[in-house]
Every structure is written in C-alpha cells, then in structure tokens.
C-alpha cells in the first residue's frame, strides 16, 4: 500500500494506491485537477511507506504509481524487503525503474538467516529459479553452494539481511516508461492484447471504462477502431460463451464486450441458464445480453425439459402458489397446466430447456432498458 499527499496549485489531498479509476477521479476532483493531462501531479508528502520517500517533492505520474501499488500489493513473504533493499542497492528513484524492479526480484536474493549454510544456498536458488525439488532439502549441495556464497564476499549486509545480486540473471526492463507490461492484478474474465503502431497494452475485463480509455491513449490510437485486439486468455469454462465473447469483441468492440463481462462476472452466474435465456429472448447484441444477465432472476429455467407435462410438474413442485394437494395429484392434468404456464408467462422451449418469466418486468422492458422506446408508424 502506498499513500501520497498530492498537490495541485493550492489544493492537496491524500490518495492511497492501488486505487480504482473512480477513487482516483474523486481525489482529482477534490483538488480541481480532473482535467490535468498528462496525469502528473506534485507529491508534497509520502505518507507511507517511508522507503518511497524518493517520490516526495517531485511530480509523478499517478497511473505509474497505481501500477506500482498493484505490483507491491502482490508481494509475498519477504519480497517487500527484497524490493526495498534492491532499490537502495541500485539507487533506483524513478517510477519506471521501480516498476521494472518489481518484475526482477529473482535477481536479488535476500538471505535473512545466515547461520545455516544449507538454508542460505537453498533460499538463494529458490529466489533465482522460482522453485526447487521439495524432497532434497538436506542435499549437501545446498550447504556447499551457501558456503561459496558467503566466502565470495559479494553479499551486502542490509537492515533486512544479506543481499546478493545474481549476475547470471539479467535485469529485464518490461516497462518502457509508456506502455505497461502484462500483469493480472484481480480476477478477470477476458485478458486481451491491444496493439497500435508497434506499441502494446493489455486489457483485463471487466474493468472500469476509463482504464480502457487510458490504455488506448497510451498507445496513441486515434480511435478504438484503430487498435488491433487479440486474445491472451479467457476465463470462461463454457465453449459457447467463449466463442460468443470473441464474436462480440470482433464485431461490436471492446467497450461492449467489457459491459457484458461486467454483467456476467459473478460467482453465482449460471451461464447455461443465461445462454438459454438469450435464445429465448433472441438477444441481438452485447447490450441486450448484458441486460439479460443483470435481470437473470426474472426468468425461470427448467433445465432438460422437453414437454409441457414436465413444466406442469416442475411448477407445482417448486412454486408454492401452485402446490397440488397430494390427495388429488393423480387426477391433476400436468400437461394442460404446463401449457397454461407457457401461455400466461410467455414460456418457450429452447435448446432442450424451458424458459418463462413470471415477474412484473416484461422481456421488452429488460431488452430495451435505458433505450428510447418508439412506436411504429410515428
């Protein structure tokens, strides 16, 4: 977590990173800096962490700070100490350098316990390589390697341990100071590569629309249509929806895809039901699909139903308003009742399932929410 006091003219406010675009905009509005471009503001104070005091009394790019905040928020174990000690060792004091450092911590092993040669060797190699066999912790090769490390004199004593620089591990500059490298910070459905004029950005949907705006601006693209999109990953375990999402991206664009991704991005979203509802409603575009997803509870989904007899049985068993007394159940005409349900609630068989809407919200109201309704012939 990073907290800065940012200043614009005579106004200043606190802002914590990482933050959402909405939170950043709210902070900018508080100091009347919402129209400042590029988004570089003066840092009057680094509230925390103290180790980033190099950012104080200078102008910084808030999007860079936010990206760094996300990277630091993902640090695990002693990685934050590694980061600070490597930063001091290298003399890094710019945001591009700090962002790149966050991707290169494997170059800087930090050994906190130097009393056990085996642990020294193993921790060093684990940092550099990322993984080691779990069943050879007692292998003497680690102690031999640890002893050579200590005898080399290359370790630098720091506040948090003995810092080494692995010369065989190159320092890779993923961030060029303009376009952010790929980094998945939060759970997402769609991971896309956006390219224009030799530059690359990455989109993680669903996201705030302004995040897409900023990515395209960093690319220098005149319009969204000028950006070439390709898929890195899609986290939807449903082949039909995977193909539908790709079609929407190609035919309608990333903003429409983002709205749909936001609508379906919930742990309890039943994609099979949504697919059936979309067929039932004959949804034409991403906007209508998103509205159906937001109103999915308006629809009753009878999975695997092919006959009205099944509908009658389902409704009488699952809707207390239509419960049938067991003493007369054998005389009840479930098929006729199922047909009645289909008629009054506009039910339809679709793809081996049955969909109906027994709420006060009509299908037309759902499909055309926020759209002007027109009357034919006028």
Where are these regions (language model features)?
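Non-Sec secretion/translocation targeting segments of pathogen effectors
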Residues: 141, 333, 367-378
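Residue-level signal for functionally critical sites in structured catalytic/ligand-binding pockets
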Residues: 7-9, 114, 143, 159-160, ...
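Long, highly charged low-complexity segments enriched in Glu/Asp and Lys/Arg with interspersed Ser/Thr
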Residues: 147-181, 339-371
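Short, extreme N-terminal segment that most often corresponds to the first beta-strand
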Residues: 1-26, 182-209, 356, 373-377
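Amphipathic alpha-helical packing elements
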Residues: 14, 130-150, 321-342, 347
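Mixed-charge (acidic/basic) macromolecular-recognition segments
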Residues: 28-139, 161-186, 206-330, 365-368
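Generic structural motif recognizing short loop/turn segments at the entrances and edges of beta-strands
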Residues: 1-2, 11-13, 37-42, 138, ...
């Amino acid at each position: 977590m990073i907290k800065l006091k940012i200043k614009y003219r005579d106004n200043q406010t606190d802002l914590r990173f990482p933050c959402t675009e909405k939170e950043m905009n709210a902070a900018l509005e508080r100091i009347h800096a919402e129209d400042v471009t590029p988004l570089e503001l003066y840092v009057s104070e680094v509230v925390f962490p103290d180790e980033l005091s190099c950012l104080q009394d200078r102008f910084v790019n808030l999007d860079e700070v936010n990206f760094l905040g996300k990277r630091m928020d993902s640090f695990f174990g002693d990685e934050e100490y590694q980061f600070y000690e490597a930063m001091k060792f290298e003399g890094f004091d710019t945001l591009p350098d700090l962002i790149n450092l966050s991707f290169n911590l494997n170059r800087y092993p930090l050994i906190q316990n130097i009393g056990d040669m085996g642990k020294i060797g193993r921790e060093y190699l684990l940092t550099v390589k990322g993984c080691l066999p779990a069943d050879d912790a007692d292998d003497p090769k680690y102690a031999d390697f640890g002893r050579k490390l200590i005898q080399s004199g290359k370790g630098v004593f720091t506040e948090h341990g003995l810092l080494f620089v692995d010369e065989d591990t190159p320092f890779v500059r993923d961030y060029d100071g303009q376009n952010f490298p790929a980094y998945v910070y939060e759970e997402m459905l769609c991971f896309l590569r956006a390219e224009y004029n030799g530059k690359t950005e990455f989109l993680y949907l669903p996201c705030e629309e302004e995040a897409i705006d900023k990515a395209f601006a960093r690319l220098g693209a005149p319009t969204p249509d000028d950006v070439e999109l390709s898929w890195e990953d899609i986290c939807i375990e449903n082949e039909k929806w995977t193909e539908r999402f790709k079609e929407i991206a190609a035919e309608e664009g990333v903003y429409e895809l983002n709205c749909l991704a936001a609508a379906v991005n919930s742990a309890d979203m039943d994609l099979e039901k949504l697919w059936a509802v979309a067929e039932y409603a004959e949804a034409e575009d991403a906007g209508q699909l998103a509205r159906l997803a937001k109103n999915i509870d308006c629809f009753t989904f009878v999975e695997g139903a092919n006959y009205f007899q099944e509908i009658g049985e389902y409704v009488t068993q699952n809707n207390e308003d239509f419960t049938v007394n067991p003493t007369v159940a054998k005389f009840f005409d479930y098929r006729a009742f199922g047909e009645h349900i289909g008629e009054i609630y506009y039910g339809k068989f679709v793809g081996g399932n049955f969909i109906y809407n027994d709420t006060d919200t009509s299908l037309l109201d759902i499909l055309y929410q926020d759209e002007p309704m027109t009357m034919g012939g006028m």
